[in-house]
Protein backbone atom coordinates (compact mmCIF):
# COMPACT_ATOMS: atom_id res chain seq x y z
CA UNK A 1 0.00 0.00 0.00
CA UNK A 2 1.33 3.45 -0.94
CA UNK A 3 2.04 6.00 1.78
CA UNK A 4 0.08 9.24 1.62
CA UNK A 5 1.42 12.65 2.68
CA UNK A 6 -1.19 15.33 3.47
CA UNK A 7 -0.67 18.96 4.47
CA UNK A 8 -2.99 20.25 7.19
CA UNK A 9 -5.00 23.29 6.07
CA UNK A 10 -6.62 25.87 8.32
CA UNK A 11 -10.24 26.87 7.73
CA UNK A 12 -9.04 29.81 5.60
CA UNK A 13 -7.11 27.42 3.32
CA UNK A 14 -3.63 28.30 4.60
CA UNK A 15 -1.19 25.43 5.07
CA UNK A 16 1.46 26.17 7.73
CA UNK A 17 3.87 23.52 6.39
CA UNK A 18 3.48 24.52 2.74
CA UNK A 19 4.08 28.17 3.67
CA UNK A 20 7.11 27.18 5.75
CA UNK A 21 8.58 25.21 2.83
CA UNK A 22 8.02 28.11 0.42
CA UNK A 23 9.99 30.44 2.72
CA UNK A 24 13.07 28.20 2.80
CA UNK A 25 16.07 28.98 0.58
CA UNK A 26 15.94 26.95 -2.66
CA UNK A 27 18.62 24.38 -1.73
CA UNK A 28 17.21 23.89 1.75
CA UNK A 29 13.71 23.48 0.26
CA UNK A 30 15.05 20.82 -2.14
CA UNK A 31 16.54 18.91 0.81
CA UNK A 32 13.22 19.17 2.67
CA UNK A 33 11.30 17.75 -0.30
CA UNK A 34 13.88 14.97 -0.56
CA UNK A 35 13.24 14.06 3.10
CA UNK A 36 9.47 14.19 2.50
CA UNK A 37 9.93 11.82 -0.44
CA UNK A 38 11.94 9.47 1.80
CA UNK A 39 9.04 9.41 4.27
CA UNK A 40 6.58 8.77 1.45
CA UNK A 41 8.68 5.90 0.06
CA UNK A 42 9.57 4.22 3.36
CA UNK A 43 6.71 5.24 5.67
CA UNK A 44 6.91 3.92 9.21
CA UNK A 45 10.07 1.97 8.35
CA UNK A 46 12.01 5.25 8.25
CA UNK A 47 13.95 5.73 11.51
CA UNK A 48 16.39 8.16 13.15
CA UNK A 49 18.06 10.40 12.18
CA UNK A 50 15.33 11.14 9.59
CA UNK A 51 12.32 10.89 11.91
CA UNK A 52 11.84 10.86 15.65
CA UNK A 53 8.88 10.61 18.01
CA UNK A 54 8.26 13.91 19.81
CA UNK A 55 8.99 13.49 23.52
CA UNK A 56 6.51 14.33 26.26
CA UNK A 57 3.21 12.79 27.33
CA UNK A 58 1.02 15.45 25.75
CA UNK A 59 2.77 14.94 22.38
CA UNK A 60 2.29 11.16 22.43
CA UNK A 61 1.09 10.82 18.82
CA UNK A 62 3.37 13.41 17.22
CA UNK A 63 6.47 12.77 15.13
CA UNK A 64 9.07 15.07 13.63
CA UNK A 65 10.66 14.86 10.21
CA UNK A 66 14.21 16.03 10.83
CA UNK A 67 15.80 18.08 8.05
CA UNK A 68 19.42 19.17 8.18
CA UNK A 69 21.07 21.27 5.49
CA UNK A 70 24.60 22.47 6.32
CA UNK A 71 24.20 24.23 9.70
CA UNK A 72 20.45 24.80 9.27
CA UNK A 73 18.11 22.45 11.10
CA UNK A 74 14.38 22.29 10.40
CA UNK A 75 11.54 20.15 11.63
CA UNK A 76 8.14 19.22 10.25
CA UNK A 77 5.71 17.97 12.89
CA UNK A 78 3.25 15.30 11.78
CA UNK A 79 0.98 12.53 12.99
CA UNK A 80 -0.21 9.23 11.57
CA UNK A 81 -4.02 8.88 11.93
CA UNK A 82 -4.13 5.60 10.00
CA UNK A 83 -1.47 3.11 8.94
CA UNK A 84 -0.14 4.72 5.75
CA UNK A 85 -1.26 8.36 6.06
CA UNK A 86 1.03 11.12 7.33
CA UNK A 87 -0.49 14.54 8.08
CA UNK A 88 1.98 17.43 8.26
CA UNK A 89 0.93 20.02 10.86
CA UNK A 90 3.71 22.54 11.38
CA UNK A 91 7.20 23.37 10.14
CA UNK A 92 9.91 25.45 11.78
CA UNK A 93 13.62 26.17 11.84
CA UNK A 94 15.04 24.83 15.06
CA UNK A 95 17.28 27.83 15.80
CA UNK A 96 14.33 30.16 15.30
CA UNK A 97 12.27 28.37 17.96
CA UNK A 98 15.12 28.60 20.47
CA UNK A 99 15.37 32.33 19.83
CA UNK A 100 11.64 32.84 20.36
CA UNK A 101 11.70 30.90 23.62
CA UNK A 102 14.64 32.97 24.85
CA UNK A 103 13.01 36.24 23.87
CA UNK A 104 9.86 35.37 25.83
CA UNK A 105 11.75 35.06 29.11
CA UNK A 106 11.68 38.18 31.25
CA UNK A 107 15.03 39.78 32.22
PLM feature spans:
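Basic, Lys/Arg-enriched alpha-helical interface segments
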Residues: 1-73, 82-85, 93-107
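Conserved catalytic cores of phosphodiester-cleaving nucleases, focusing on short active-site segments
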Residues: 89
Amino acid sequence: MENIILFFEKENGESPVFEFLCELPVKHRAKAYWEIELLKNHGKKLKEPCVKKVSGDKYEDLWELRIKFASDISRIIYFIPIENTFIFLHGFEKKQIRFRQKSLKSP
